[in-house]
A protein has these predicted regions:
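Juxtamembrane/interface alpha-helical elements of multi-pass membrane proteins
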Residues: 62-154, 275-375, 383-386, 397-419, ...
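Alpha-helical hydrophobic packing sites
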Residues: 33, 111, 178, 454, ...
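Transmembrane helix interruption/hinge and helix-loop junction motifs
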Residues: 55-63, 231-236, 284-296, 492-495
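Short amphipathic alpha-helical segments
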Residues: 2, 25, 487-495
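Residue-level marker of alpha-helix boundaries and capping positions
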Residues: 10, 92-93, 458
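Hydrophobic alpha-helical segments characteristic of transmembrane helices
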Residues: 2-28, 98-119, 144-215, 222, ...
Length: 495
């Protein structure tokens, strides 16, 4: 009876089509997911019983544990939808360079399927490499022709830009349209599509500001006002809105476009950063600090670590911003008869960061090693190196291809700069948040003595600084922003 009841309420049986469609998009083993879901489903009654016991014994807030049951029950739908959305975002970021691969191949008489076969062995493409594996699987395992396999994948990707590429190619092949020209048109469209995605993100986070303001500023004020009738302050109730922080942060991660950072931290950097970790514990042990000061110390350690990551981001941006001019110079050298590698050896730049990158590239060429072995902390640069190497192997040193590549990359950089410019307001909000809390809580405490509320100022300021850093710079490691927030907090707490 229990088994039959479980089958009736099993989410796999209720919305199997939706889950299956999600899995088809990114590729997964549905039976493995089903077994995983069956195992974790038995946690639902356990959590319910624990929440009721803790509610009766300790506090009503333990009933909030039942929220976990919602996520467990909808786990198959949530996890497949998240993976699908992540795959879609990665693919959208990779499409411009992929289309340049396809464009070069079309000039050499190779079709789109051949491009996917090449991408399947790529070390750089992640989303499209997975897509290539699924496409090739339909041909090699299911016995479809490459044309019908692309038609099948077009249906899976209906509504996104990759689906449009599939449809455009298959329809173009049917009626004999020139594919190089059509792919160039798609290149322009994909830049427009990225622009729309960035614009949509800016609109969504601007709307989110109102929610953040209500939750993390107005709500604590209201809760504090309600506690005026009591002689004591319930700190848990005042910080209760912060429990929603992970959900909002997760939402921001879902709606954010992929900006392309691929930060790698080596083991030596991790070892160096570990030396400063004991500092907060030592200070706490020696000086018996209040909780707000302990939190501030740990926040300071986080900021130190963020400098390592932010430095890598800055270098990656510098390399990216100089690359269009270098590609244009390579095109000029190709015009007068140089090969791609000899053109790179002739290059000269002023930027310190790019000079180091170029030095690594020259070293690889002189050692006759793959150019794509030079890795940066930004995906699009790594992908362009793989594209250049691919073009060089094919002996297709075409001036116009490099000019087009330079133009596409320059448009991409302008889009990134535009969206970062539009999000600067969040940096200002993060910096002034401690000041707003200081004055708002200061007014409240003057009306009635309610004790020290420094902990509230610290917790909300740190939470919002991390949130705004994520929103405005697409990473929580926005070192300048975090430092300014820390300085404000120190001034407020100590002066």
């Amino acid at each position: 009876l229990r088994q039959r009841l479980f089958e009736k309420i099993n989410l796999f049986n209720l919305i199997a089509t939706r889950i299956n469609d999600n899995i088809k998009y990114y590729g997964d083993d549905i039976e493995r997911l089903r077994k995983e879901y069956t195992r974790i489903s038995f946690l639902i009654p356990v959590i319910s019983i624990i929440s009721v016991i803790f509610y009766l014994k300790f506090s009503k807030y333990f009933l909030l544990l039942d929220i976990m049951n919602f996520f467990i029950y909808f786990y198959p739908l949530l996890i497949t939808q998240i993976r699908k959305d992540e795959q879609r975002k990665i693919i959208e970021n990779e499409i411009p360079i992929f289309l340049l691969f396809a464009y070069v191949n079309s000039l050499l008489g190779k079709n789109l399927y051949k491009t996917f076969e090449e991408i399947r062995n790529s070390k750089v493409f992640k989303g499209l490499r997975r897509e290539a594996m699924l496409l090739v699987k339909e041909v090699e395992v299911l016995g479809k022709s490459s044309f019908s396999a692309m038609e099948s994948r077009a249906k899976v990707h209906r509504g996104d830009f990759l689906g449009k590429i599939y449809t455009t190619y298959t329809s173009g092949e049917s009626i004999g349209i020139s594919m190089p020209e059509r792919i160039k048109d798609l290149l322009n469209e994909t830049i427009d599509n990225l622009n729309l995605n960035f614009g949509s993100y800016v609109e969504k986070v601007n709307e989110l500001v109102e929610i953040l303001f209500m939750l993390f500023l107005v709500t604590p004020m209201i809760l504090l006002a309600f506690q005026y009738i009591s002689s004591t302050i319930n700190m848990f109730e005042l910080i209760f809105p912060l429990l929603l922080f992970p959900i909002i942060f997760f939402y921001v991660s879902l709606i954010q476009p992929n900006i392309g950072y691929d930060i790698k931290i080596n083991i030596n950097e991790i070892k160096k950063s570990l030396y400063i970790l004991p500092i907060p514990f030592i200070f706490t042990f020696l000086f018996h600090l209040n909780l707000e000061y302990e939190i501030l110390l740990f926040y300071s350690i986080f900021i130190v670590f963020s400098f390592i990551v932010y430095r890598k981001i800055s270098v990656a941006d510098a390399v990216l911003n100089n690359l269009p001019y270098i590609l244009s110079d390579i095109a000029d050298y190709l015009r007068i008869g140089y090969s791609i590698k000899s053109a790179i050896l002739k290059l000269n730049v002023d930027s310190t960061e790019f000079k180091k990158f170029l030095g690594e590239l020259v070293t690889k060429i002189k050692k006759n090693e793959a150019m794509s072995n030079v890795k940066t902390n930004i995906w699009i640069v790594n992908a362009i190196l793989e594209l250049i190497e691919n073009i060089d192997k094919k002996g297709f040193a075409d001036t116009y291809t490099f000019k087009d590549l330079s133009l596409v990359l320059n448009n991409y950089i302008l889009l990134r700069k535009k969206v970062l410019q539009n999000l600067r307001m969040f940096n200002i909000l993060a910096i002034i948040t401690p000041i707003i809390f200081y004055f708002a809580l200061g007014v409240m405490t003057k009306i009635k003595a309610v004790g020290n509320l420094d902990l509230i100022i610290v917790l909300y300021s740190i939470a919002l600084s991390i949130m705004y850093a994520k929103i405005s710079r697409f990473t929580i490691f926005n070192f300048p922003l975090l430092v300014l927030v820390l300085v404000n907090l120190i001034l407020i707490l100590f002066f």
